[in-house]
């Protein structure tokens, strides 16, 4: 019996507690938003199959707890990840500053050459912005990775971010040469909606 997919990619979302990791995953996997999710304890995952350049890619997206007390649990899941999304909250400067610590954690625990992507969430809360887009863009370029600002609430750039990472993994894993793969690593596809003010405050 033929498989329902061509490739299986394990993705991992990391970042401080409260940046909206769970909301992003639920938005991507189920196209749903609820700001009453219980903060993740340990590890949970969702699955969605997407079409990338004619290939069916099954994405297994793992949600991790951001609290330091769960760090050992999170670390156990780094090694099998083919792509890691580092998430911060644009209204929380500390969560952005801690991205450097999460980068260090990836270097110490993940497989060499794992694909990474920087993601600034809650861009629907422009009035409360504390982290400027230029700051994150600079950080992403320093590390040679892509950057998106997203809103789990409005769904802005969520699919684009996950699909971009999946394309990069497919290319690296020997997929046929993809279109537009010479574009700079930092991308911002759309302007985020500034009207919505509700947030997903849980991890």
UniProtKB/Swiss-Prot annotation:
Lipid-conjugated positions (S-geranylgeranyl cysteine): 200
Family annotation (NCBIfam families): small_GTP
Phylogenetic lineage: Eukaryota, Metazoa, Chordata, Craniata, Vertebrata
Post-translational events: Ubiquitinated via 'Lys-11'-linked ubiquitination on Lys-58; impairing the recruitment of guanosine diphosphate (GDP) dissociation inhibitor 1/GDI1.
GO BP annotations, alphabetical order: bicellular tight junction assembly; cellular response to insulin stimulus; cortical actin cytoskeleton organization; endocytic recycling; endosomal transport; endothelial cell chemotaxis; establishment of Sertoli cell barrier; exocytosis
The name this protein goes by in its record: Ras-related protein Rab-13
Top-level taxon in the UniProt lineage: Eukaryota
Sequence positions that bind GTP: 17-18, 20-23, 40, 66, 121-122, 124, 152-153
Gene: RAB13
Keywords assigned by UniProt, alphabetized: Cell junction, Cell membrane, Cell projection, Cytoplasmic vesicle, Endosome, Golgi apparatus, GTP-binding, Hydrolase, Isopeptide bond, Lipoprotein, Magnesium, Membrane, Metal-binding, Methylation, Nucleotide-binding, Prenylation, Protein transport, Tight junction, Transport, Ubl conjugation
This protein's domain notes: Switch 1, switch 2 and the interswitch regions are characteristic of Rab GTPases and mediate the interactions with Rab downstream effectors. The switch regions undergo conformational changes upon nucleotide binding which drive interaction with specific sets of effector proteins, with most effectors only binding to GTP-bound Rab.
